[in-house]
């Protein structure tokens, strides 16, 4: 097995040392070493603990140097049963995870240990602490990432190698969009996906694994979980472990990668807990003073290099719906697009329940997409916004009280709203409707003609859950 993690300590020719536990306070462990054997920051340490006659090995990560002979480390597992004086081994390298094809179809923890099988035969392991790509290695051009999902491609297009925020409550279809994107990357583009469950409920992670297995997309996906009940050190590092696996697929195998992080807020929350445990003075609203730095270390590694990319879809929880909270506000500065799932749209049975008015993208601009795409998107949004403005009048007075022009616009908006729905491949077993991949040119042309009134004669129901405009015309013939 190849381990590509060279430690500064071993590079200097120094043999990794042996220390002893001096103090244990929850997940924080102080370890004493000889002054000339002090481990580097981020170095992994190992210590054995015995509970009920069973000996388990704990992994610690060095976070601080205290004096000349003591390090303060954060445990990646529960420290129950750990005692003062226990022997601690310096591994001579940071925490590493397996990388490569062997990781596909499996579930791992933060240490790279498989959770679904006993062993994974990976030839190479990479350190989870890596530098972001150098400036001269980055892809200089901005390129759209075509998903084949109409509402996203038209109104909130994704950036290849960009970062997308996915906002959505429970039951609005967030998991289905994640599964569909994984399937499309694998089947349409031959790419691979990596999923990071940060602070996930164990039940949710298990459900996702089983659903992905049933949908047939697990073979092209690696999953890394740090559950909600695990120490903050685990939840802080699990996203870096998943990102490291994604970087290998991008840099060595030259593949386009889709990286999911659910939930990025839990990453910030774990960092706040670790910061408090280390005795740092809290900053605004109690968050860690290093919040922007920690977020930047993660986000700057998610990017496009020459010809290949990591595109990230990040679920974001907004505390008390306060967008000015430091946690989401720090995340927003890194996002290239925002996909907002709206419960009122899902209540209408329209899926994906993406809000066409609340979702946005940095590249929704004629300079990146072309004038036709931009003009079509803005016209669709104008019609839908006018329809939204008229809904109170319709609810109180009825549609007959509107002007003839507004009546036409409302009927057109309802057709557009239904045409934004689309059958997904991973939902075929539930809907019995074959999934559709709609090319970008077809999406633009269909909505352009629809917004001009070319299809006002077709019934509304014909536009529901179809792919291209030809499907709507076929549906109209059958109604």
UniProtKB/Swiss-Prot annotation:
SUPFAM superfamilies: C-terminal domain of alpha and beta subunits of F1 ATP synthase, N-terminal domain of alpha and beta subunits of F1 ATP synthase, P-loop containing nucleoside triphosphate hydrolases
Annotated InterPro entries: AAA+_ATPase, ATP-synt_VA_C, ATP_synth_F1_bsu, ATPase_alpha/beta_chains, ATPase_F1/V1/A1_a/bsu_N, ATPase_F1/V1/A1_a/bsu_N_sf, ATPase_F1/V1/A1_a/bsu_nucl-bd, ATPase_F1/V1_b/a_C
GO cellular component, one term: proton-transporting ATP synthase complex
Location of the protein in the cell: Cell membrane
Keywords from the named record: ATP synthesis, ATP-binding, Cell membrane, CF(1), Hydrogen ion transport, Ion transport, Membrane, Nucleotide-binding, Translocase, Transport
Domain of life where this protein originates: Bacteria
Catalytic EC class: translocase
A GO MF label: proton-transporting ATP synthase activity, rotational mechanism
Main localization (coarse): membrane
Catalytic activity: ATP + H2O + 4 H(+)(in) = ADP + phosphate + 5 H(+)(out)
Record's bilayer topology term: Peripheral membrane protein
E.C. numbers: 7.1.2.2
Amino acids binding ATP: 168-175
Biological function: Produces ATP from ADP in the presence of a proton gradient across the membrane. The catalytic sites are hosted primarily by the beta subunits.
Family listed: Belongs to the ATPase alpha/beta chains family.
Assembly mode: F-type ATPases have 2 components, CF(1) - the catalytic core - and CF(0) - the membrane proton channel. CF(1) has five subunits: alpha(3), beta(3), gamma(1), delta(1), epsilon(1). CF(0) has three main subunits: a(1), b(2) and c(9-12). The alpha and beta chains form an alternating ring which encloses part of the gamma chain. CF(1) is attached to CF(0) by a central stalk formed by the gamma and epsilon chains, while a peripheral stalk is formed by the delta and b chains.
HAMAP family (UniProt xref): ATP_synth_beta_bact (MF_01347)
The protein's name: ATP synthase subunit beta
Species for this entry: Frankia alni (strain DSM 45986 / CECT 9034 / ACN14a)
